Regions:
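Inter-heme linker and motif-flanking segments adjacent to c-type heme-binding CXXCH motifs
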Residues: 232-247, 251-257, 264-281, 290-306
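Short metal-coordination and nucleic-acid-contact micro-motifs, chiefly zinc-binding Cys/His arrays
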Residues: 105-109, 218-222, 251, 258, ...
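Hydrophobic core positions of alpha-helical segments in small-molecule transporters
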Residues: 228, 282-285
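Membrane-embedded alpha-helical bundles of multi-pass integral membrane proteins
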Residues: 1-244, 289, 306-338
Length: 338
């Protein structure tokens, strides 16, 4: 047997370690994370507390109340400014966000959210360190990966894991501070050691709290504390025909030779082969779909998990097979695990 400190890989000809879908999702995540960090210094979007208003695409975004206070406009024009500059943009943004969530679920979380990107990265590092994606995982996950590689835990990976937690905590705290105060002032003060007392306090406390969250509570935050994720899930649960991961129960016997790769791959620690109500916090990251695709490809079969929507999504909600229309092949159905 190979020593446990060394990763052991079993090559599978023609099978990549990541599917094309996951490569595409990774590029979306990287792009949005870069945008998240660079938006303040590029004046794309931030709240400047020194000016007392938002900055959007380099322009001051105010509600026009200063002109009313100076007597330059009347009450009606001031009310119109509130509606046009404040309520309408916010309503359009919220409506669009809720519609996407109602139709596709927590797509923002799985494909864009800069916090979830860190969650997945720390999960991967921690799994390489001790075989568990979280300190709260009861037992180590199987060393065999969906693509056939066998990777054993290596304690040396605790070093990049801890460094990653601290680095991303600091980067997040620094970035959040640039959303509130002039970015170049913050970056200059950080590099030269000239942070003010309040700036240093924000950065220190923010880094500490985020390090604790990234290290010990990142999944708990996504599942129970994130308001953005919660509202997406609520909108998604209100639509029985929304896009959801469906399991082909007609071929469930094919799972016998698998080590629950779909469950092991889920960053949110969910079980994809179950009812929708038990997948309330699913981020539509499709890691489970990719894992099943790779496992089945190794034996020349198609995946048992795939995205379904419309009438094909109803079995995932009810647990009952969908009624088959004449001349149509049966749709993949989902039923609760025994």
């Amino acid at each position: 047997m190979m020593p446990r400190r060394f990763p052991v890989a079993v090559d599978v000809p023609g099978l990549a370690t990541r599917t094309a879908l996951q490569h595409r999702r990774a590029w979306f995540q990287i792009g949005f994370f870069v945008l998240f960090v660079l938006a303040p210094p590029l004046d794309l979007f931030r709240l400047d507390l020194t000016r007392g208003h938002f900055i959007l695409f380099g322009q001051d975004w105010t509600l026009g109340l200063a002109a009313f206070q100076q007597g330059l406009i009347g009450p009606l024009e001031a009310a119109w400014n509130l509606v046009w500059r404040g309520f309408v943009p916010l309503a359009v943004l919220v409506a669009a966000f809720i519609w996407v969530s109602w139709r596709y679920g927590r797509l923002y979380c799985g494909w864009l959210c800069p916090h979830f990107s860190v969650v997945e990265l720390i999960n991967g590092l921690m799994r390489r360190a001790n075989g568990r994606p979280s300190v709260w995982e009861r037992r180590p996950l199987p060393p065999q990966q969906p693509d056939g590689r066998v990777v054993y835990p290596n304690r040396w990976y605790w070093i990049p894991t801890v460094l990653g937690v601290l680095a991303f905590a600091f980067l997040w705290a620094l970035t959040l501070l640039t959303y509130l105060l002039p970015p170049f002032e913050i970056y200059h003060n950080t590099l030269t050691g000239g942070l003010t007392r309040n700036q240093g306090l924000f950065l220190s406390v923010g880094t500490l709290l985020l390090a604790i969250e990234f290290g010990f509570a990142r999944h708990l935050f996504c599942r129970f504390a994130c308001a953005v994720g919660l509202f997406q899930s609520l909108a998604w649960m209100g639509n029985d025909r929304a896009m959801v991961v469906g399991f082909d129960t007609g071929r469930a016997a094919a799972c016998r030779d698998c080590n629950n790769a779909c469950d092991n791959a889920c960053p949110m620690r969910l079980q994809p082969r179950t009812l929708k109500r038990k997948m309330f916090t699913c981020t539509e990251c499709a890691e489970c779909i990719s894992a099943c695709t790779q496992v089945q490809a190794r034996v020349g079969r198609s995946t048992l998990l795939r995205w379904v929507e419309g009438d094909r999504a109803l079995p995932v909600v009810t647990g009952r097979p969908a009624a088959q229309a004449p001349g149509r092949s049966p749709a993949p159905t989902t039923q609760p695990d025994a």
